From Swiss-Prot:
The keyword RNA-binding applies. GO terms for biological process: translation. This is one of the proteins that binds to the 5S RNA in the ribosome where it forms part of the central protuberance. The keyword Thylakoid does not apply. It comes from Sodalis glossinidius (strain morsitans). This is Large ribosomal subunit protein bL25. GO terms for cellular component: cytosolic large ribosomal subunit. Transmembrane segments: none annotated. The gene is rplY.
Length: 94
């Protein structure tokens, strides 16, 4: 099972997302189940390398958010139109 580390986002909105992307991170969200949605930030290079591995899009992943592990699946991925960059990922709780 693939494991990805994440941090809960403190700031939200367009400006905060742009600052994240300039810091080589990007926003994501975890939703589904009975819990409330959680806005998180991920390290771009780590996720970019992880997404090339088999099973990233189809298997259940372990997402560690501030020390707490959640089982999630990738629901949607947004990419930059011509650069090899991820801009946002939606995770759904498994």
């Amino acid at each position: 099972m693939l494991t990805i580390n994440a941090v809960i986002r403190k700031d939200q909105g367009k400006g905060a997302s742009r600052r994240l992307r300039l810091a080589n991170k990007f926003p994501a969200i975890v939703y589904g189940g009975t819990k409330a949605p959680v806005a998180i930030e991920l390290d771009h290079d780590i996720v970019l390398n992880t997404q090339t591995k088999e099973g990233f899009y189809t298997d259940v992943l372990a997402l560690v958010i501030d020390g707490k592990e959640s089982k999630v699946k990738v629901q949607a991925v947004q990419r930059h139109s011509f650069k090899p960059k991820l801009t946002h990922i939606d995770f759904v709780r498994a």
